[in-house]
């Protein structure tokens, strides 16, 4: 890797500061509890203690009891699924948290994470401080991107 490319990748790593760990997200309730289906063996068992899990999507497993996000088909159609992480962003984040680094994929996913922060700004702009019932769909979405939904 050229030194300029290496510097660019290192800069992306510096800006990536998620507010929630995968374990905390799973405990709070994300992706209708069905994100991993049967693919949890590669992750620490501790992540799944008190996690809200389901074999199929169950909106009641989500922290805000709403469906937030697009379908898997839409993820594929938009080019958001990469062969390294066929389940998408959260799978990448879990593997990243466990130490895996693939610079070109990391850069793509960190850019996507950073761009999602616009939803945090929308909640702050449109909701009274502490009103967790305001914009529940956006709150669920930012939770699924490792941002604190209780802003």
Predicted regions and their residues:
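Compositionally biased, intrinsically disordered low-complexity regions enriched for acidic
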Residues: 1-84, 88, 100, 118-141
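Hydrophobic transmembrane alpha-helix bundles
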Residues: 96, 126, 145-147
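Eukaryote-biased recognition of C-terminal alpha-helical segments
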Residues: 138-146, 150-151
